[in-house]
Regions:
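Conserved SAM-binding motif I beta-strand of class I
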Residues: 13-17
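S-adenosyl-L-methionine
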Residues: 18-56
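Conserved SAM-binding loop of SAM-dependent methyltransferases across substrates and taxa
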Residues: 1-5
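A conserved structural/catalytic subdomain of Rossmann-like adenosyl-cofactor enzymes
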Residues: 42, 47-49, 54-276
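Extended, gly/pro-poor, charged amphipathic helical "stalk/hinge" elements that serve as dimerization
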Residues: 7-11
Length: 276
């Protein structure tokens, strides 16, 4: 990477953040990493009709972890096509991203979404149909439980797509470390845990990918025929529920509930800290 390339990258970094604290943290993070004038603005990315996104607002690459689990007011929903309107923020952000990279021949995106995006039908199915008709959804990275704890315990995934014809969809199941069922604020996910996935990825062109106990591929036609269901079981991982006793299942359920209670307590302490 040359100095000129780094300068060009810094000059073309853009972002939008609605809430004041994440906005401040994002600005500080960029400054600390050498970006002298961060192109981050405060505002709602969904506040403008997607049909009116200007040329200057269109980009080549989007990396985003938008909020999900919330709802947008009706005035914001009206910024989207009638047949694709929904209150769920995850679907609105996905549409917004698609509109921003659609006209770029090299447009590509990595976006964090909740599990519901994978199996939703109705409006969600229509949005996924549009996604797979305009882009190549090439990878679904299934994250372990509790990656964003204590802020949310909703299971999450990362969708990777690019401008181009839809090909096979690869799924990669990222396991939690041995002996761990969930992550916590004090024991978060570490960058090193992506090492196996990075080695499997195959570089920019995603060459030499192979199926293994964590990765499998699905042709687009079965996905279309299923109503665009992406919540697919790993065929290389047998369903061990059939081979476990009711006593074992109940014990695991109790352990899971205890972990969830601890996450809620951590979140309660976080909220109390912000209130001070």
């Amino acid at each position: 990477e040359t100095t000129q390339q780094r300068r060009r990258l810094h000059e073309n970094l853009r972002g939008t953040e609605k809430k004041p604290l994440p906005y401040l943290l994002g600005m500080m993070n960029l400054v600390l990493h050498g970006v002298g004038q961060p192109g981050i603005v405060r505002g709602n990315s969904l506040a403008k009709p997607i049909t009116q996104i200007s040329r200057s607002e269109r980009v080549d690459v989007v990396l985003t972890n938008p909020p999900f689990g919330g709802e947008e007011e009706k005035s914001v929903q009206e910024n989207f096509p009638v047949q694709l309107r929904t209150a769920e923020t995850a679907w609105l952000f996905l549409q917004s991203v698609m509109a921003r990279i659609e006209r770029s021949p090299h447009g590509r995106c990595g976006i964090v979404v909740p599990n519901s995006v994978l199996f939703d039908t109705g409006v969600g199915g229509k949005i996924k149909a549009e996604l797979m008709s305009k882009f190549n959804l090439h990878t679904v990275l299934r994250l372990p439980n509790g990656v964003f704890a204590p802020y949310t315990i909703i299971p999450s995934n990362v969708l990777f797509f690019e401008k181009g014809k839809q090909g096979p969809v690869w799924f990669y199941e990222l396991p939690a470390p041995d002996g761990r069922k969930n992550y916590t604020k004090t024991k978060p996910m570490r960058f090193e845990e992506f090492a196996d996935c990075a080695a499997w990825w195959g570089g920019r062109q995603r060459t030499s990918r192979v199926e293994n106990e964590r990765a499998w591929r699905v042709e687009p036609d079965p996905i279309r025929q299923s109503g665009y269901n992406l919540d697919l079981h790993n065929p290389h991982r047998p369903d061990d529920l059939e081979h476990r006793s009711p006593k074992e299942l109940v014990a695991e359920l109790i352990d899971t509930e205890r972990e969830l209670l601890k996450l809620y307590e951590d979140l309660q302490r976080e909220i109390a800290g912000f209130a001070l």
